[in-house]
Amino acid sequence: MQIYNGSLDVQSITNEWYDKFKDKNCGALITFVGIVREEGGISALSFDIYEPILKKWLDAWQERAKKENAYVLFAHSKGDVPVHTSSYVAGVVSPQRKVALRLINEFVEDFKANAPIWKYDVINDERIYAKERSQAINGAGLLA
């Protein structure tokens, strides 16, 4: 779990992951990069993260991936991230590409639905909670 202030340096993060795993006899490193879109008058997105719950969520994913001899990685921004820059990079490393391709999709979708990260639009330098694009965390009472 890598948390950064502001935009992510995608090339640096993915190169670090590649260098870490290239000699581990893995056949696949699949990545997903989320880029902030320019829409609805936003100049940026802003993120708050509750790291203790996020770590538990990631630990559960690591256990799941381990059962398939795979490993999940991710980096996310906190604070403001301007349009056309990245706030999220996820990766799956596996000896088998089919496992990595399946897990990256499941990981990204579960992240969107369950990770304790709150998103705000930044419009005219004002931070506005993006409730319509956010998901309630089941049983947490958040976003009720």
Where are each of the predicted segments found?
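N-terminal, polar/charged subdomain of small-to-medium soluble alpha/beta proteins
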Residues: M1-S86, V93-P95, V99-N105, E109-A144
